[in-house]
Every structure is written in C-alpha cells, then in structure tokens.
Amino acid sequence: MESILTSIKKMLGIEAEYTHFDADIIMHINSVLMILNQLGVGPAEGFIIEDDTSTWSDFVPDETPVQLEAIKSYIYLKVKLLFDPPLSSSVIESYNRQISEFEWRLNVAVDPMPS
C-alpha cells in the first residue's frame, strides 16, 4: 500500500524525492486526519503521520476501495487548500463544495445503519 505522504505529494505535483516541503505537508495532512477522526473515519484514538512510512492501510485497514479513494480525494483537496490554494475564488468555491460533499458522504458511510 502506498505511503500517505507520497501519494498526497504526488497529487500536489511534488516529486516524492523532493522533501523541502514535507514538514508543512505533514502538518496539513495531520490536521485533515483530525477532521476525519471527528467525522468517524479512521482509528477511534486518532492517527498522525510523521514521515513517508505511514500507509493508507495503517490509517483505514478495513475500508472498501471506494471509501479509500474518497478519503484520499478529501485529504488532497483539504491539503491543497491549506498548502497551495488556487488564486481563483470560483476554483476555491468548487473545491469547498467537493469537500462538503465528501464530508457528508464519508459521514454517511461510517454512520451505522439503523436495524
């Protein structure tokens, strides 16, 4: 399974070998992981990454591939807005709408269905 840091860097257009921004990106990833924890996604005790050794299966070992891809997209969008926000307000608004939809869908996915 791919490293969380490496895959988010790839989505941001940063080569895995380029480590100059790793501390900033890790901080933003951890902030988003905290938000996901509050939504009920991931380990109940929370989860942080410190380097490129933490993988997606460490964070969400039991998620379906579809849920995992939504989690990756959500983390990317949030980190993109924190680390390298677009200049256009319409693009920012589009990102925020996508983020809101992912939050709703991830919350529904982890909320137990009534019996």
Residue spans of the language-model regions?
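Conserved short "hinge" loops at termini or chain/domain junctions
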Residues: 1-67, 103-115
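Short loop/turn elements at secondary-structure junctions
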Residues: 59-115
